[in-house]
């Protein structure tokens, strides 16, 4: 399941060595701006992370972020902020605001020099905060000066959703409750809970990220919620399934979190983002146990192996990376979606991954005509070394293929007890046997792209959601449609 991505205003200004023009770049942090800063008492030092970083990220990172660096200057991390651009002029000189190019540019009267260009100047209180922070020694009060600032900022304070949605919104994530009687649905700044058989709204869990990409209802009273705002912000949090109380924000990201997972023993959590990043946590830890950036494109999904040994991340870069669940160390790379020989050849983005407890195999899917069924240990063995490259090229490999019959990309995948559910841009949901590789049933009724599929833990129901905001629930025994509803309160 995926949706989202990065954005940036890449206006061209090659003649300027350091510019701080406004762009719709990486994260801005709602609720942490100048209003709170204005309340800071004069006796207190200015906090870089709480007061200065949100201003710089909001107004400057579109042209000076990790992906775009006008004038050779970046400020997405503190070490980059403190470095000079192509001009060689120090952006920040600790204790000397008058010698700092950053302050000179944001206060310049010449419109060709003042930054951000082609946008309103920074407010006087914002300029004063930055100047005071430099005067006080330009101290860093985050965790790691080399890490992106957006991954270290305090979690956002999210707004409430409208009481009634003016329009239906796409539903990108669904999940059954452990007893199979309710369905959690990703909404706009909220998670909504519905009766599975009637489609009746039960309750709303408010003040969540703008877009909900992944839900894991792993115990009756708690849901793992992941999402964010495309190109700006990502978040993974543990939320009460009853009240919506946020019990813990595990981490923030510099882009949308597209997938999250909980290990079967509920001791570990993993997540992946559109910022090419994968992270792992211990359930009781306050910080991530590991972080990995081994993908070259969006991380679209993650899954744990049944024994908890591995975390597997799927990506638009056409690979799946197998990580050690405890340390994050790369165990192997699965290249089965870049197959060069045989029936299912091609190079395909991967949008979903799931683990089957019965066969102890991973299933992955995205573009292309088949679901891949494979094993991490065998994949590593087949990767071999450069010395046996020619031999490996002509080997069929251990991967098995489930022809899914879809003509377009597959976004949703859920696997339980030897049965795989999949759906995508064709607007159809199908059920497959992992053992026989055969199609067992087709669930019809979706009116547009399917983004997410889910099977009830009891095995009685299956569900799907998609672009038009509908959730459909079928009886698994006979494929009959039980209910369908627009999961937008008030619609």
Question: What kind of feature is each model-predicted range?
Answer:
Residues 1-20:
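N-terminal secretory signal peptides that target proteins for export/translocation
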Residues 5-9, 40-41, 313, 422:
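Short linear motifs centered on Gly/Pro in flexible linkers and helix caps
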Residues 14-18, 44, 389-390, 481:
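N-terminal leader/targeting signatures
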Residues 21-33:
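Bacterial N-terminal signal peptides
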Residues 32-36, 297-300:
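A broad helix-preferring feature
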Residues 38-174, 178, 187-188:
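Aromatic- and Gly/Pro-enriched helix-to-coil junctions and flexible linker segments
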Residues 141-491:
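WD40-repeat beta-propeller superdomains and closely related acidic/aromatic-rich repeat-like regions
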């Amino acid at each position: 399941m995926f949706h989202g991505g990065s954005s940036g205003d890449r206006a061209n200004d090659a003649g300027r060595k350091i510019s701080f023009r406004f762009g719709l770049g990486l994260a801005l942090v709602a609720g942490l701006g100048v209003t709170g800063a204005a309340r800071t008492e004069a006796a207190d030092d200015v906090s870089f992370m709480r007061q200065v970083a949100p201003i710089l990220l909001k107004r400057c990172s579109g042209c000076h972020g990790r992906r775009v660096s006008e004038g050779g200057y970046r400020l997405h991390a503190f070490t980059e902020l403190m470095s000079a651009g192509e001009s060689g002029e120090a952006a920040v000189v600790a204790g000397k605001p008058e010698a700092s190019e950053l302050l000179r540019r944001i206060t310049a009267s010449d419109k060709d020099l003042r930054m951000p260009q082609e946008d309103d100047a920074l407010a006087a209180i914002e300029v004063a905060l930055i100047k005071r922070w430099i005067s006080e020694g330009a101290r860093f009060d985050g965790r790691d000066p080399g890490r992106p600032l957006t991954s270290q900022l305090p979690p956002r304070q999210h707004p409430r959703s409208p009481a009634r949605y003016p329009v239906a919104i796409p539903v990108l994530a669904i999940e059954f409750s452990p007893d199979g009687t309710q369905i959690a649905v990703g909404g706009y700044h909220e998670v909504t809970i519905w009766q599975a058989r009637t489609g009746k709204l039960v309750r709303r869990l408010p003040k969540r990220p703008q877009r909900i990409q992944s839900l894991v209802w792993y115990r009756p009273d708690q849901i793992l919620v992941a999402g964010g705002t495309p190109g700006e912000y990502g978040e993974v949090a543990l939320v009460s399934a009853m009240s919506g109380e946020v019990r813990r924000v595990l981490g923030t990201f510099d882009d949308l979190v597209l997938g999250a997972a909980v290990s079967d023993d509920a001791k570990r959590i993993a997540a992946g983002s559109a910022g090419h990043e994968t992270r792992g946590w211990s359930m009781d830890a306050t910080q991530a146990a590991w972080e990995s950036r081994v993908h070259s494109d969006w991380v679209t999904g993650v899954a744990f192996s049944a024994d908890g040994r591995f975390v597997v991340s799927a990506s638009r870069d056409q690979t799946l990376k197998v990580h050690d669940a405890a340390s994050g160390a790369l165990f192997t790379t699965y290249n089965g979606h870049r197959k060069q020989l045989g029936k299912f050849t091609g190079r395909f983005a991967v949008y979903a991954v799931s683990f089957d407890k019965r066969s102890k195999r991973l299933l992955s899917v995205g573009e292309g005509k088949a679901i891949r069924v494979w094993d991490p240990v065998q994949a590593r063995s087949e990767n071999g070394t450069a010395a046996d490259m020619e031999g490996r090229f002509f080997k069929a490999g251990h991967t098995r293929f489930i022809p899914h019959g879809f003509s377009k990309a597959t976004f949703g995948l859920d696997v339980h007890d030897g049965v795989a559910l999949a759906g995508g841009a064709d607007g159809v949901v199908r059920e497959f046997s992992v053992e026989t590789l055969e199609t067992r049933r087709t669930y019809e009724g979706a009116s547009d792209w399917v983004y997410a599929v889910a099977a009830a833990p009891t095995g009685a129901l299956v569900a799907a959601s998609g672009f038009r905001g509908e959730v459909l629930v079928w009886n698994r025994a006979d494929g009959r449609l039980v209910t369908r509803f627009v999961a937008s309160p008030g619609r």
